[in-house]
Amino acid sequence: MTDAVLAKPQHSAEFRLRRFLNWFPMGLTYAFLYMARYNLTVSKNALGDLMSKSDFGLIFGIGTFTYAFAFLVNGPLTDRIGGKKAILISAFGAATMNLFMGLTLYLLLAHHVQLNLLIVFSLCYLLNMYFQSFGAVAIVKVNASWFHVRERGVFGGIFGVLISLGLYFAFDWSEAVVRATMANVTTDLNFLEAGLRHLIGATHATIDQTWWIFFVPAIILYVFFILEAFILKDRPSQAGFADFDTHDASSGEEDRRFELKEILTRILTNRVIIIVAIIEMCTGVLRQGIMHWYHIFAKEQLGLGPADFMQAHWGLMLMIAGASGGMLAGFLSDKVFGSRRGPVAALLYGIMILCTIIMSFVLYQGVYLAVLVTVISFSVIGTHGMLSGTATMDFGGRRAAATAVGLIDGAVYLGTAIQSVSLGFLTERNWHYWPLFLIPFSIFGFVLAVSIWHAFPKARKASH
């Protein structure tokens, strides 16, 4: 295919504005889905002995196994029903499950109703993660029709920013909710925290109102469900613009009927997609292995409390690291490596190898550890945005984008589940196992990323 055919298209200002209005609210919905997913980690610290590390690892592990395998159904389903319906299902379902988890804590803490927290949370979080699994496939499915292959590296960076913003919501906003709803406030509250405290009537509370960690994202997601129902469009033609050839793996097949067997065969026999899926399994281990367990390690082993910078602003650090990693990865992919994704993933995995090895030697040196986990977050979120957010569109094409991201994001959460159960078990025995567990996955991911260094999507046939 000639360079002229693959040249970046020139869009009108009106199209770019409408595309922004399409992906930005959907991106915020996706970010708040993260808040409704990882608030479990913040609740674990807030609940103390009510949720042990083993319980947390099991609940999170059950949810992530569900998330991983739900993609096998929800990816092809989203290719059939479209991304808009998928994101609406995701937002409404996740909001409802968070509402149920909040009600469970309310009954348990405020009214002393005897409930088995492990069983109830495992079931609710399982269903939460099932609905959550529609989110990533929806955002990639919709944007596959709005972004040309030469624009997708930058979109992969944007995807990384959205993930990072979601982590900021999940950790910092959830921590802010914890501070605002404590019976005995031990730190100065900012304007928003004080406002929330008065709004929900926590000023004169006699117990910590931890259930608001789940109520707040539920309310936000219900609002975005209504917003997206009116704003989001699956294709440019639904918003008054002409559809265009994005020159991905579905190029020239726009009018062909969706055939599940054909699309599954295409995805499962694509060497690059399978390798990307395995790389992303390693990404899942490394991303959650740092993101969740550092937060717990810092409190348990380093004695950092809610007022300490890294605990109070862990989400902000993840957002800055992830956003910069995502945008740099997108820039390098499109501008330096000719819209190839493998070289960027290999570069970032090389950084992760170095950091995880050093981490094993400076585990209890707070400042050095903070720098290392931030750099790993920079690298892992950049990799995830580039592979799950961009390579899936490239090699799956518009017709199979959701199925491709389903397989690949499913692999991410298979890795997440592996680390959740494994590190929950290992860290109960010795925290030194934490970085040692991560090192092999960083090496394996690097080797696989190098193997797809030259991979680039090919259109099925010339488009008209």
Model-based region annotation:
Residues 159-236:
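Helix-loop-helix hairpin linking two adjacent transmembrane segments in secondary transporters
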Residues 339-387:
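C-terminal transmembrane helical hairpin of 12-TM major facilitator-type secondary transporters
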Residues 153-179, 322, 409-419:
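Glycine-rich segments within core transmembrane alpha-helices of 12-TM secondary carriers
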Residues 38-42, 171, 266, 270-330, ...:
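Extracytoplasmic gate region of multi-pass secondary transporters
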Residues 124-163:
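Cytoplasmic helix-loop-helix junction between adjacent transmembrane helices
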